[in-house]
Each structure stands twice: as structure tokens, then as C-alpha cells.
């Protein structure tokens, strides 16, 4: 969101709009331009509408349609090599508990963008950071939650990501779903926290983590191989640090 203020009397109003845009829905940067002639305007304080000031941030949490949640559950149950890829939307939505519960309940390997790290500890048995390329390339289902499909995730494009994988995506911004750079098999417009909560309820008893044992084992083997290779000391926990 970007706007220019020409009338100093509208500063409180437009500042409120900018704050709402920055903090609600899908948070992001905003820009307000105040030209010099606006800054030096002399206005009567009584002519300023202060009613827009101090309004609470609108924090809507749209749920996912139940039929789409059911479709995602069915796709996960059918998948043999699923991957969960999440971003900062998990943090903004405060959905870390729901994500942790989903990973624990299903045993699906997960990866985060740099902006979304830490929502689930990286020493979790379903986290294989050094095997990231293998996971993305070999996955038969990729569930993306709360992240743009930009250069950070290579736009989810082959060959870095499997060309044949089923793509499911949850995002609070309808434009992210409608304008996805990769065709979505399941595109859900919903708040991450609410949608993952719905998914956790719907998935109960329908997925056995053991069905992905072979997938996790393959990634664990690749992880161990990467850690043992050249440069493996960069992953060492040894104390003191080798100079």
C-alpha cells in the first residue's frame, strides 16, 4: 500500500488506513508520502477529524471451506512422499502450536523459509534441513502454508521442485492463491492458524505416521550423508569452536 497525502487534515485518517493495511490480513510494508507543501500547511485543529485515530487493528481470521480441508486430508492420506513448506505467515498468525501438532500427528517432513524458522525446532525428527533439495525434488505432495511463492522458494518451479507433485497451498491473501506462479491442485484462502487447526481435527485417525517411515528414512540417510561430507564441520556442535 502506498499513498500521498495532499491535505494535512487527512493525516490521521490516512495514517490509520496505512496501519490497518500493514498489520491486518497479510501484514506487509506500507508507504505514506507527505510532500513538503503538505507538511507546512497550517490548518485549524478543529477541522481535523480525529475519530479515525486509535482504531483497533482488524484481525480477521477466515476459516477454510470444510470441503477443501477434506480434499487436503484425502491427498495427504494418498501421498507417499509429502512435504510441508511454511513461511512467516505461521508466525504472523501465531500458528506454531497448530503446525507443531500437525507435524507430530502425521510425521510429515517439514521445511521453513528463512523468515519462518523456529516455529518447530529444527532438531525435530521430521526436520531434515541438509536434505532439502532431495525432499523438494522427490516429493509427491507439497503443502505450502503462509509463504509467497517467490525467489526464496524458487517459485516452486521444476527442476528444484518436483514437476509431478500435487501442490496444496493455504494463504490468507486471495491474490496469492489466484495469482500463484505454479498451478495449484488445492488452493485454500484462509488464516494459517485457523486452517491448520481445522486440518488437525479433520486428520485425526486418518493418517498413520508409519506410512511415511520409508520417506523419512530416505531423507534421514541423505541428511547423514550431507553432514558427513566436505564442510561437515560447519554443522558441528563441538566446543570450543574449531578456529
Spell out what each predicted region is:
Residues 64-65, 71, 76-142:
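Anionic-ligand anchoring segments at beta-strand to alpha-helix junctions in alpha/beta enzyme folds, i.e.
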Residues 12-13, 88-94, 238-240:
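Active-site glycine- and acidic-residue-rich loops that bind
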Residues 17, 21-78, 224-228:
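Conformationally flexible catalytic loops at phosphate/diphosphate-handling active centers
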Residues 8, 58-64, 88, 119-127, ...:
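Short, flexible loop segments at the rims of nucleotide/cofactor-binding pockets, characterized by
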Residues 1-7, 16, 20-28, 44, ...:
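Generic secondary-structure signature for well-ordered alpha-helical cores
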Residues 34-40, 88-90, 174:
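Glycine-rich beta-alpha junction loops
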Residues 1-14, 113-218:
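Glycine-rich, acidic loop regions that bind phosphate or pyrophosphate groups
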Residues 218-243:
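Active-site diphosphate/adenylate-binding microenvironment
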Amino acid at each position: 500500500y502506498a499513498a500521498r497525502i495532499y491535505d494535512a487534515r487527512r493525516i490521521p485518517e490516512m495514517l490509520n488506513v496505512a496501519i490497518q493495511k500493514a498489520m491486518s490480513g497479510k501484514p506487509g510494508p506500507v508507504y505514506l508520502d507527505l510532500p513538503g507543501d503538505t507538511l507546512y500547511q497550517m490548518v485549524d485543529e478543529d477541522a481535523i477529524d480525529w475519530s479515525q485515530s486509535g482504531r483497533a487493528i482488524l484481525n480477521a481470521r477466515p476459516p477454510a471451506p470444510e470441503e477443501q480441508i477434506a480434499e487436503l486430508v484425502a491427498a495427504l492420506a494418498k501421498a507417499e512422499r509429502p512435504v510441508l513448506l511454511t513461511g512467516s505467515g505461521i508466525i504472523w498468525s501465531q500458528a506454531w502450536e497448530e503446525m507443531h501438532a500437525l507435524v507430530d500427528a502425521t510425521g510429515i517432513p517439514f521445511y521453513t523459509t528463512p523468515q519462518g524458522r523456529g516455529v518447530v525446532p529444527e532438531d525435530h525428527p521430521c526436520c531434515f534441513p541438509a536434505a532439502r533439495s532431495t525432499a523438494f525434488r522427490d516429493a509427491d505432495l507439497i503443502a505450502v502454508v503462509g509463504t509467497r511463492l517467490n525467489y526464496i522458494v524458487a517459485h516452486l518451479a521444476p527442476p528444484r521442485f518436483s514437476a509431478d507433485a500435487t501442490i496444496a497451498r493455504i494463504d490468507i491473501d486471495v491474490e496469492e492463491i489466484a495469482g500463484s506462479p505454479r498451478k495449484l491442485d488445492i488452493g485454500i484462502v484462509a488464516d494459517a492458524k485457523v486452517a491448520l487447526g481445522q486440518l488437525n481435527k479433520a486428520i485425526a485417525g486418518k493418517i498413520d505416521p508409519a506410512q511415511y517411515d520409508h520417506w523419512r528414512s530416505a531423507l534421514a540417510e541423505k541428511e547423514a550423508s550431507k553432514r558427513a561430507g566436505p564442510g561437515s564441520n560447519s554443522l558441528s556442535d563441538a566446543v570450543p569452536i574449531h578456529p
